[in-house]
């Protein structure tokens, strides 16, 4: 049995038994990792707080060769993004980000770029408009996946130029791209279409965003 350590983002957790949970992580070094966290439901669980969605953690896990589920040994919080610090709109987008990452991340694959992108967007969400960050996030996920088409084939020349420029910026600079509300909406429709086409389904959280915002 090999033991691994990596920075990670907690993506999702769901019950496995009365006291255990299966947890999905995006790790910096090993891609998507699914593992069992034992004793999570106990009052003094060592995992307290670290399994909340999109928590930045230092993860230690072990796994036998050819075993699908790892065993989560330790999960230390580096940075949390608790729901009470954000509006309901931001929290809804966070749920969307989690679902995107579950779908696009791959197991046993280096995910340095995807991890850095995700963490930067989460950190910027404390200061910048969440809808603009969501577009930046979607565009880069599609690009990293290799399924982002030439923008001038999908957008007007002016908007394609703006979006190309935005993607060259650091996430903290996205507002300087100068996208109008109408342009953001057009970009949202395009990203939603591209994600849905690639995954061959519409994400549940995308439906909620469309209905509520």
Which role fits each region the language model picked out?
Residues 1-21, 26-213:
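Non-catalytic alpha-helical scaffolds and adjoining flexible linkers that form interface surfaces
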């Amino acid at each position: 049995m090999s033991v691994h350590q990596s920075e990670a983002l907690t993506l999702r957790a769901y019950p496995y038994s009365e006291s255990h949970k299966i947890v999905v992580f995006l790790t910096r070094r090993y891609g998507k990792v699914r593992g069992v966290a034992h004793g999570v439901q106990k009052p003094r669980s060592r995992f307290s707080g670290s399994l909340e969605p999109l928590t930045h953690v230092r993860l230690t896990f072990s796994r036998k060769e050819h075993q699908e589920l790892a065993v989560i040994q330790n999960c230390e919080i580096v940075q949390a993004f608790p729901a009470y610090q954000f509006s309901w709109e931001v929290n809804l987008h966070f749920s969307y980000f989690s679902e995107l990452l579950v779908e696009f991340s791959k197991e046993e694959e280096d995910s340095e770029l995807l991890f850095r992108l995700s963490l930067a967007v989460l950190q910027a969400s404390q200061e910048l408009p969440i809808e603009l960050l969501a577009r930046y996030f979607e565009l880069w996920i599609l690009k990293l996946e290799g399924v982002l088409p030439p923008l001038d084939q999908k957008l007007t020349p002016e908007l394609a130029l703006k979006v190309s420029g935005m993607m060259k910026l650091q996430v903290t600079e996205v507002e300087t791209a100068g996208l109008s509300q109408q342009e953001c909406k057009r970009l949202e429709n395009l990203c939603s279409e591209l994600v849905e086409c690639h995954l061959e389904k519409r994400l549940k959280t995308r439906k909620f965003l469309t209905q509520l915002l």
